[in-house]
Design a protein with these regions (language model features):
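Cap/insert and terminal regions of metallo-dependent hydrolase folds
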Residues: 80, 198-200, 204-276
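Active-site metal-binding loops of divalent metal-dependent hydrolases
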Residues: 17-19, 71-74, 108, 135-136, ...
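Metal-dependent catalytic neighborhoods of phosphoester/phosphodiester hydrolases
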Residues: 79-80, 114-124, 261-262
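Metallo-beta-lactamase
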Residues: 84-95, 99-111, 126-184, 230-246
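Active-site glycine- and acidic-residue-rich loops that bind
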Residues: 112, 181-194
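Residue-level marker for buried hydrophobic side chains located in beta-strands
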Residues: 67-69, 104, 130, 201-203, ...
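Conserved beta-strand hairpin/beta-sheet module of binuclear metal-dependent hydrolase folds
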Residues: 2-92, 194-207
């Protein structure tokens, strides 16, 4: 599955790695009561016995470079049987993985980087330079304690550590590829990055990962955040910027294809889908 659009003058495509199924909202979002969370889901036609999200990977051709942002779950079915669709989506869009020059990672959680290596130990994107924050890679390679973190540590050792010679570290504020700037947004993970594009677009990664819950309850802490309090601070700061600067949004986990704008809704926010 793919969706073509434009980011400024650049050709862009959203390519799907398929849906994920997360636990019930009250187990993912801490703070609001279950009734409030479920009410927001029901109001947008979503079920309440689980949290459904997409994996919308951005592919953009800019400055003579073909760039892919994040790459899904690979062959893992950790969050449901229907992930792992990225290779088929790229093929449907007519994109050879070998033609991808750069692989940019918002962060190193399973659903963003486990498509980097094949099960046979060879890179799925054999000609791509990998861009990631140094603090992100170093955190996961330091073996941080915690049961939930063990999977991410193992994933980084499989998918990123063998490719150190292909990795380029990116810094806050750096325009590291033509028309693309990295912005440090820690909390979800220590080295989480979002990306600004010429043409007033922002790829937001997992700072506000769910529509509508991340917008209706920006103060809710996420069980997936390494530093939940910092995650809330970063989310509020980014959402304010998205509204103030009128930036269009590429939401990795938002309903397909994840494109739209953010508006204020009283003291909270709402996501408004659309390419324009």
């Amino acid at each position: 599955m793919f969706h073509r659009f434009r980011i400024g003058q650049a050709a862009a495509t959203i390519v799907s790695d398929g849906p994920l199924v997360l636990p019930v909202a009250a187990k993912v979002f801490q703070g609001p009561d279950a009734a409030a969370l479920n009410g927001a889901l029901s109001a947008t036609g979503q079920r309440t016995d689980a949290v459904d999200v997409q994996q919308n990977c951005l592919l953009i051709d800019t400055g003579g470079k073909r760039v892919l942002f994040d790459n899904g779950m690979g062959s893992s079915k950790l969050y449901g049987p229907d992930s792992g669709q990225l290779p088929a989506s790229l093929a449907q869009a007519g994109v050879d993985p070998a033609s991808i020059d750069a692989l940019v990672l918002t962060h190193a959680h399973s659903d963003h980087c486990w498509g980097t290596m094949g099960d046979d130990g060879t890179p799925n994107f054999p000609n791509a330079t990998i861009y990631i924050a140094q603090s992100e890679l170093e955190f996961w390679e330091s073996n941080p304690p915690g049961q939930r973190r063990e999977r991410s540590v193992a994933g980084v050792k499989k998918h990123l550590s063998p490719l150190h010679d292909r990795i380029t570290f990116i810094r806050d504020g750096e325009a590291f590829l033509p028309g693309i700037q990295a912005i440090d947004t820690p909390g979800h993970t220590p080295g989480h990055m979002v990306f600004l594009f010429d043409g007033d677009w922002c790829l937001t990664g997992d700072v506000a990962f769910h529509d509508p819950l991340s917008y209706a309850f920006p103060e809710a802490e996420s069980v997936f955040d390494v530093d939940p309090r910092q995650g809330v601070e970063t989310r509020r700061r980014l959402l304010d910027r998205l509204v103030t600067d009128r930036l269009r949004v590429i939401g990795y986990h938002h309903p397909w294809p994840g494109l739209g704008r953010v508006e204020r809704a009283g003291r909270t926010y709402r996501f408004v889908p659309g390419d324009e």
